[in-house]
């Protein structure tokens, strides 16, 4: 059982996806609080926008690591979300700071429902990814010479 670069990439991805799962759960909670009018949209958007760049950087980092270690299934699974992150950040509203959530439009019914749906999809993706990376890391450790 050897500790290869691919196993190292999967180990880092497990830790990173743990943070992304936290970010996704926090986003779902914040958007649900906006939907039920428990919180101020300016404060919620400020809190959510602080998590955008760390999530995108974390996801981009382990996607690049998978490219370097040439893990095809992981690359193919992560590239659509990486391209989606690039697209949403390029099309973000004009604001003074980084982020994609605009407090003036977040309370529109369509914007709020699409944000909630995207948050749930990201949470499901990160959960499935976590268990796949766990399996792939164990498989890589067991089968490496």
From Swiss-Prot:
Pfam families the record matches: Cornichon (PF03311)
Main location: endoplasmic reticulum
Organism field: Caenorhabditis elegans
Its job: Negatively regulates export of glr-1 from the endoplasmic reticulum to synapses.
Tissue/organ expression: Widely expressed in the nervous system including in the AVA interneurons.
Name listed for the protein in its UniProt record: Protein cornichon homolog 1
Null allele phenotype: Hyperreversal phenotype with considerably shorter average forward time than wild-type and a corresponding increase in frequency of reversals. Increased anterograde transport of glr-1 with corresponding increases in synaptic glr-1 expression and glr-1-mediated currents. Altered pattern of glr-1 glycosylation, indicative of increased export from the endoplasmic reticulum.
Ranges that cross the membrane: 5-25, 57-77, 116-136
Family: Belongs to the cornichon family.
Subunit structure of this chain's protein: Interacts with glr-1.
Membrane topology: Multi-pass membrane protein
UniProt GO cellular component terms: COPII-coated ER to Golgi transport vesicle; dendrite; endoplasmic reticulum; endoplasmic reticulum membrane; Golgi apparatus; neuronal cell body; perinuclear endoplasmic reticulum; synapse
Entry keyword set: Cell projection, Endoplasmic reticulum, Membrane, Synapse, Transmembrane, Transmembrane helix
Compartments it resides in: Endoplasmic reticulum membrane; Synapse; Cell projection, Dendrite
């Amino acid at each position: 059982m050897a500790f290869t670069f691919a196993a190292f990439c999967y180990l880092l991805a497990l830790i990173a996806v743990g943070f992304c799962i936290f970010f996704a759960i926090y986003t779902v909670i914040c958007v649900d609080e906006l939907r039920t009018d428990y919180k101020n949209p300016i404060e919620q958007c400020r809190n959510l926008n602080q998590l955008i760049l760390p999530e995108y950087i974390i996801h981009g980092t382990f996607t690049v690591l998978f490219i370097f270690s040439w893990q095809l299934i992981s690359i193919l699974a992560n590239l659509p979300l990486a391209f989606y992150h690039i697209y949403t950040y390029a099309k973000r509203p004009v604001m003074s700071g980084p982020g994609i959530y605009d407090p003036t439009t977040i309370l529109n019914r369509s914007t709020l429902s699409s944000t909630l749906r995207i948050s749930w999809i990201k949470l499901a993706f990160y959960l499935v990814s976590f268990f796949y990376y766990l399996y792939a890391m164990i498989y890589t450790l067991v089968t490496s010479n």
